[in-house]
A protein has these predicted regions:
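Surface-exposed amphipathic alpha-helical segments
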Residues: 1, 105-134
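Short, low-complexity, polar/charged sequence segments that are solvent-exposed and flexible
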Residues: 26-27, 38-42, 97-101, 128-132
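Signature of long, low-cysteine stretches enriched in small and polar/charged residues
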Residues: 47-104
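Glycine-rich, often proline-containing surface loops adjacent to acidic residues and nearby aromatics
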Residues: 16-19, 75-78, 105-111
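Short, flexible beta-strand-to-coil junctions
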Residues: 11-12, 23-27, 82-85, 112-118
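A short, polar/proline- and glycine-enriched secondary-structure boundary/capping micro-motif
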Residues: 17-19, 29-32, 89-90, 119-124
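Secretory pathway targeting signatures of secreted, lumenal, and periplasmic proteins
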Residues: 2-49
Length: 134
């Protein structure tokens, strides 16, 4: 669709995934913690899990951490947390970066996640975070 892009890179024992999504900006409330989490879950549900009817969502066990910052004059929100698969046993860390494009009045989010059940995830997460910094 026009508002969602998902791709992933598969390793033998791990997976890195990327979502880029956008939606209309409706004022400051569009960047609230509740709105960002709701948007993430709405778009993450489009990523199918391994079993029928399963899909990605944000873990309810740990509350995501939010950080507001400015980069080159633009306001951003970083959200870090853990994702799960509703209806299956998968999960891992994620980080997302959200900003508003004032020219189009749209919110844009780059969301990166890692699945690596047997290996440490730190280096995989650093790689996906680097995609934002480049």
């Amino acid at each position: 669709s026009d508002d969602f892009l998902w791709f992933r890179y598969e390793f033998p024992a791990a997976s890195q995934g990327f979502m880029l999504y956008s939606y209309p900006y409706e004022g400051k409330q569009s960047l609230s913690e509740e709105a960002l989490l709701a948007a993430r879950n709405r778009f993450a549900a489009r990523i199918p899990g391994p079993s029928d009817g399963s899909y990605m969502t944000t873990s309810k066990v740990f509350t995501p951490r939010y950080r507001f910052f400015r980069l080159e004059g633009r306001a951003w929100v970083e959200m870090r947390g853990f994702w799960d698969v509703e209806g299956d046993f998968m999960g891992g860390p994620f980080v997302s970066y959200t900003t508003v494009d004032t020219a189009t009045d749209r919110v844009f989010t780059l969301d990166c996640y890692v699945y690596s059940p047997k290996l440490p995830k730190r280096n995989y997460m650093r790689e996906v975070e680097h995609c934002f910094i480049w």
